[in-house]
Amino acid sequence: MPRRIPWIIKYRPKKIADVVNQDSAKKQFIQWLESWLKGKPSKKAALLYGPAGCGKTSLVEAAANEYGLEIVEMNASDFRRRQDIERIAKTAAFMRSLFARGKIILLDEVDGISGTADRGAIDAILHLLEITRYPVVMTANNPWDQKLKPLRDASLMIAFKRLSERDVIIVLKRICQLEKLECEDAALREIARRSEGDLRSAINDLQAIAEGFGRVTLNWVRELSAYRTREYAPFEALQKMFNARYIFQAKSAISQANIDYETMMIWINEHIPTYYDDPEEIWRAYEALSRADVYMGRIRKSGSWDLLSYVFDMMGPGVAFARKIYRYKWKAFRSPKRLQLLAQTKRSREVREGIAMTLAPRLLTSRATIKRDVIPFLKIIFTHAPKYAAKIALGYGLTEEMIKWLAGPKSSEVLAYYRRLKR
């Protein structure tokens, strides 16, 4: 019996024009790839991001096919450790293709890299970008995790939008024609609706029903096609929440966001005044958000996670239905400035915390007391009395990084005395 080929492989786009929609992304990607082929790339890597099943990997494969390039593919979910990436990707970055063709190095699903378990993987990718002779393409569903910031900075960011139901239906109809399959239009519409723009899952559902029953009807789709629990990037979650027509839509948008609840609260807090224009609507939205914050505080104190449902009610429907009348409004949501500031000051806060942890047991007090009462005086000593500061640092076991943080502009002077005392 011949082996059946999955339709997502059988009908994978062979040409760039076959990739559904995504005209802006295709144009950006081709311009970047051609700049590489001419030897003058603006960025050594491109990071393609967008929802699952919207054509990111398909575009790379179609472009490689059209330009006669070999793809060296790694999936970050499978190869996570630094040595994995170095061994495979760096070999690909230098070795010529067997048929003397160019290459594209594809790192799929880089958002699958964990910040702790996969320590060193990001650094290995950054090093690869420095030495590679070939274009490097990365894909991600959600590239906005803070751990991926170095990759965002080093790459050309190319956004892919979620496919519409119409886009999905067009592809499904074409497959039905090529497979000489009897498909009800209503059934294809239902598959497309349930896919929520994920073309890959829609094709899989179509094949499963077709192979099981020989034809695709609305009844079979309703019986067998699954509603999938999808995660939304914060931008999508906010768009769905603010434009929700029904309470359940606003609530599910928040509960399915791919960031934690407290971070989502920061996103909502920043965008309420940019989305609503009416002062009363803004007040009502903040009133709902403040109640969500109260419930989160009670959860933290008591561990009563049954209150989480009320958090979702206030964050989602409470904020969304602060409006007086329904009106659809498209808004470009940006990463909150508070999160950007926290990211910029993260290392400084870590050093401050390290000083508190070092001094607290020696001074027989709490870390909070060290940060509040001791560190401000240490900063004065380290900037005005370098010799004495060096003795304190040596006596209490402070590291050179801690000295630099405390001494600021006088750090070189304090470090010189410190190193002399250590000899």
Curated annotation (Swiss-Prot):
ATP binds at residues 50-57. One of its GO terms (biological process) is DNA replication. The lineage of its organism: Archaea, Thermoproteota, Thermoprotei, Desulfurococcales, Desulfurococcaceae. HAMAP family: RfcL (MF_01508). Belongs to the activator 1 small subunits family. RfcL subfamily. One of its GO terms (molecular function) is ATP binding. Part of the RFC clamp loader complex which loads the PCNA sliding clamp onto DNA. Gene3D superfamilies: 1.10.8.60, P-loop containing nucleotide triphosphate hydrolases. Keywords: ATP-binding, DNA replication, Nucleotide-binding. SMART domains: AAA (SM00382). This is Replication factor C large subunit. Heteromultimer composed of small subunits (RfcS) and large subunits (RfcL).
